[in-house]
């Protein structure tokens, strides 16, 4: 029987949850059964993990998923956990679990993690003994670094005396191996146009809120000076793609012969006002700055980013921020913990036409950080224009308005709603109308790109 491993898709959620329910039946009769049968993966939680690219699925020739592995990055720091790994009992003992585990550990290594952790039953052959065969060793579960795992076990009601924690150290990747980097999306919590400069650019005020969801950039260093984008991005020729332009812009600051292969996994809707292309470019700048040994300072990198687009500097600096000018004057902000329902209405909104719209308000009085913090400043200058010209965006705003105060991000087309809890965000997303696509994301003060950069900086690639 042949199978292959791929990133899980949202339309596979029900199949993966069914695999988990089938796999847990194998524990009937075990002392842990009473707690195991009470714990199952909610579909909305699985969907969120898939959206973050942390679930891989084993698929047989017919297209049927027969197993999956799910990594959990909530542990933080230089470790990532195996939240769940299951194989359909009818497809057990065929190497599927081993292949899924190796695939997940390989990705974690490329992402700069130092180890992979998990909790499992000590006496079940396909649990602790299986993981031991694949490089995991038992650890002292009372160590401070496993506090998160201990709390998760308590929440699930798992019996402490039957469970063992295990860890697998990951060797640093070779300098010419693929590395994996996040490119987070953003939303604009408000957007005001306060004037127009002599050069024709508009003076803006906005708040960029970074999200924990976005694209993935994969980089492999070359030493022949060549820069290649290996993945096809519909409608975006390689030579005009911001990721290629970013690499070329940084190249003169790197040692002679520095080159790179680039792969882009798009999750953020293109042209949605979520900063996907700008974030991709920033990730290439920040990652290659270290991988190539250019070691430019953040200010210099941000200036290079500004040459690519007004939104690139905020992603280079990696902090949610109050922005002015054309978006390049940034003041970092610490914002309340919030979750966002981001709705993609699947409609193209041409930004240039909006800036030329006669009805666009271009001379609003300047806002202040305090007026934003008090909730007085929430409008988006583009929203009235987009509502009038783009019926699907208007319908998306109207639908989200039924749950709170819906807002447009950037110049659209995506809209969003801020919520106080992930549970409320997921409940709203579950009701998404046909024809729209909903995403749930958490706001982050510090970019996942900078978290990844810290992990990579903690790795001595010469093994010292």
Where are these regions (language model features)?
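Conserved N-terminal entry element of GNAT/NAT acetyltransferase domains
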Residues: 1-11, 164, 170-178
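ATP-binding N-lobe of GHMP and related small-molecule kinases
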Residues: 174-272, 290, 294-299, 326, ...
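Conserved, helical-rich catalytic subdomain that frames metal- and/or nucleotide-binding sites
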Residues: 316-405, 418-464
């Amino acid at each position: 029987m042949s199978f292959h491993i791929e990133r899980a898709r949202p339309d596979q959620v029900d199949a993966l949850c069914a695999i988990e329910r089938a796999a847990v039946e194998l524990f009937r009769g075990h002392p842990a059964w009473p707690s195991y049968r009470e714990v199952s993966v909610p579909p909305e939680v699985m969907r969120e993990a898939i959206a973050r690219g942390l679930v891989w699925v084993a698929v047989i020739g017919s297209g049927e998923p027969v197993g999956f592995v799910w990594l959990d990055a909530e542990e933080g720091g230089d470790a990532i956990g195996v939240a769940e790994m299951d194989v359909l009992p009818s497809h057990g003992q065929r190497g599927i679990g081993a292949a899924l585990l190796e695939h997940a550990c390989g990705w974690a290594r490329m992402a700069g993690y130092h180890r992979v952790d998990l909790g499992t039953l000590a006496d079940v052959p396909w649990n602790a003994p299986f993981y031991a065969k694949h490089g995991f060793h038992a650890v002292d579960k009372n160590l401070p670094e496993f506090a998160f795992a201990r709390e998760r076990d308590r929440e699930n009601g798992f019996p402490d005396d039957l469970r063992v924690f295990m860890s697998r150290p990951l060797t640093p990747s070779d300098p010419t191996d693929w590395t994996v980097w996040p490119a987070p999306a953003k939303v604009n919590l408000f957007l005001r146009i306060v004037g127009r400069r002599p050069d024709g650019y508009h003076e803006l005020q906005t708040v960029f809120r970074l999200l924990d969801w976005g694209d993935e950039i994969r980089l492999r260093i070359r030493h022949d000076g060549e820069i290649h984008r290996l993945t096809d991005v519909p409608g975006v020729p390689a030579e005009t793609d911001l990721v290629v332009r970013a690499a070329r812009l940084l190249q003169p600051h790197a040692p002679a012969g520095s080159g790179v292969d680039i792969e882009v996994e798009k999750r953020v809707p293109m042209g949605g006002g979520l900063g996907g292309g700008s974030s991709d470019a920033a990730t290439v700048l920040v990652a290659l700055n270290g991988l190539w040994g250019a070691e430019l300072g953040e200010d210099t990198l941000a200036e290079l980013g500004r040459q690519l687009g007004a939104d690139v500097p905020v992603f280079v600096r990696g902090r949610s921020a109050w922005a002015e000018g054309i978006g390049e004057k940034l003041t970092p902000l610490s914002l309340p913990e919030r979750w966002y329902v981001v709705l993609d209405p699947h409609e193209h909104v041409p930004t240039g036409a909006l800036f030329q719209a006669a009805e666009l308000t271009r001379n609003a009085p300047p806002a202040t950080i305090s007026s934003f913090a008090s909730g007085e400043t929430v409008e988006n200058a583009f929203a009235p224009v987009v509502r009038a010209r783009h019926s699907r965006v208007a319908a998306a705003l109207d639908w989200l308005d039924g749950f709170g105060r819906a807002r447009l991000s950037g110049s659209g087309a995506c809209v969003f709603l801020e919520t106080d809890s992930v549970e409320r965000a997921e409940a709203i997303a579950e009701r998404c109308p046909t024809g729209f696509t909903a995403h749930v994301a958490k706001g982050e003060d510090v970019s996942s790109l900078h978290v990844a950069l810290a992990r990579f900086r903690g790795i001595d690639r010469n093994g010292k």
